[in-house]
Amino acid sequence: MKKKYRIAVLPGDGIGPEVMREAYKILNILKYHFSLPLEIEEFDVGGSAIDKEGVALPKKTLLGCENADAILFGSVGGRKWDSLPIDQRPERASLLPLRKHFNLFANLRPAQLYSELKYLSPLAFLIVIKNGFNILCVRELTGGIYFGQPSGRSKTNNFEYAFDTEVYYDYEINRIAHLAFQLAQTRNYKVCSIDKSNVLNSSILWREIVKKVSLSYPNVHLSHLYIDNATMQIIKDPNQFDVLLCSNLFGDIISDECAIITGSIGMLPSASLNEKKFGLYEPAGGSAPDIEGKNIANPIAQILSVSMLVRYSMNLKNIADKIDYSVISILKKGYKTADIAHDNNYLKTNEMGDVIADALISGE
């Protein structure tokens, strides 16, 4: 174990600070109950940073992240800053620069439907009745059509047109594929690679390299699906999937599809990693300004983001499992926040944080 783990905490805007307060309860238990050598420092980001310092990602915040072993991120954005130029708004001017600065090429989005919450899924009950489902979307985050050049708009002969370019280098596909197979070895040993190799040259290269990488992992079963078929198969039977390996564009689409069939995005964490396993960990949802300050936001995604941080950047699987089990145990006992309750009997944000913290300490 390292002598010290430095965590940069960036609560951000909207419900970010509210759910981060509950994550602090878990961090403090890790530090004082489990004796993990954590050093935690908080920094401004997003709209709150714009209000205080004029920019969404202040130099002090970036330096604090550089000196950390991982970033625990809340959420950014809100109507207050929508009048700013697009490249100065909280989302575009903070989260994207952090991803680029730290070369966070891999986005991990778990989508799990807990058996206690099957009624939340929009899918037919018979589809999810087995054991819920547990899918991990592994999305390449720094290449592909979102970053390819040329990209733009133009006019010719009285016609206006727009264009984007899908570019993937072999090393980009290679590293995300290796990560997907390595993660599958910690789960159910299945990788399904998503592409459109019947049409796109970039997908042809994608499939070729994924096949080559798979030879290094003979105990992992590899399958391939075109993106259109994959979106249908997830609805038809999500239980058939374990790890989904996706390009930037396809991963953007399919990870959101996986999220919505769980019934509540407030349950879902995410991680963005670089090759050294430095990571930015955040809830999959947004800043939800409509419920800001009402103490009804679901803190589970933020708490599970702590679990992912402990699992991937600190490599402490046993501690991460304890956090995950604490969440499962309180769900089994019937504790719910407003977004996952089917009646008015639900816990406030701080109350949910308390019961999860108590479960983590007691191990029950």
UniProtKB/Swiss-Prot annotation:
Cytoplasm recorded as keyword: yes
Binding residues for NAD(+), per the UniProt record? 78-91, 286-298
**Gene Ontology MF, one:** NAD binding
Q: In which pathway does it act?
A: Amino-acid biosynthesis; L-leucine biosynthesis; L-leucine from 3-methyl-2-oxobutanoate: step 3/4
The UniProt entry, under Pfam families, shows: Iso_dh
- Detail which positions bind Mg(2+): D228, D252, D256
Q: Which HAMAP family match?
A: LeuB_type1
Listed name of the protein? 3-isopropylmalate dehydrogenase
Q: What is the lineage of its organism?
A: Bacteria, Pseudomonadati, Pseudomonadota, Gammaproteobacteria, Enterobacterales
